[in-house]
Amino acid sequence: MSIDTFNLFLGVMSLIALFVFIALYFVKAGYGIFRTASWGVAISNKLAWILMEAPVFVVMCVMWIYSERRFEPVIFTFFLFFQIHYFQRAFIFPLLLKGKSKMPLAIMSMGVLFNLLNGYMQGKWIFYLAPETMYQADWFTSPWFIIGTLLFFAGMLLNWQSDYIIRHLRKPGDTRHYLPQKGMYRYVTSANYFGEIVEWAGWAILTCSLSGLVFLWWTIANLVPRANAILCRYREEFGDAVGERKRVFPFLY
């Protein structure tokens, strides 16, 4: 794929993300708290998360292996950063999930498709299309890399902490919903989403790439409308207990 074709691909992905962003304010993706029978056949939540997230991990591995740049220090560092996230998301996070929740196959399939496209989008730029003079050793001391890396890992840790808080809201056998109160949940009702957005903003900055920016846009398009739906649901269930919490961005939205 030439750089011009790749840029066209990024443009198409960005337009689709815009459609998704608007649509999700009207249609709640039917997994988790919003799952309904109308979404069709569902499978184990744990299995669905593995099947949905593992493809991007595999795609990046394959693209890295076949790249002549694979052991260049900056390129290899990008690869490790990306794979740390997806190893946790595909092979650790699902096994930590509690309960017997299910995910519709339709939702899982859409997730698989996006992850395949995104794995290609990130890997194609980093391993093949980026100018050979761009990611040299001095990139490690650039403001892009330093600031982006700090944001990336801060967002990752916030996401992990927030997921931990959510997992421990219930005791074994309990199926009720609870309003999370700890950590960043004191300020927003979707702290885990805020962490993920910060993480991929860091990725876009540390790679200084359009592909990273498109991934950030997709993350926002997918998570911000859902955060809005979660806040509305919490207000219905918990009323005034929600207080002044925002949806996903502390003190803003």
Language model region names:
Residues 28, 46, 98-102, 124, ...:
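Context-gated lysine
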Residues 1-87, 92-110:
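Membrane-helix and juxtamembrane interface regions of eukaryotic multi-pass membrane proteins
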Residues 106-125:
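Active-site pocket-lining segments that scaffold enzyme catalytic pockets across diverse folds
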Residues 22-34, 87-91, 100, 125-130, ...:
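Juxtamembrane interfacial secondary-structure elements that flank transmembrane helices
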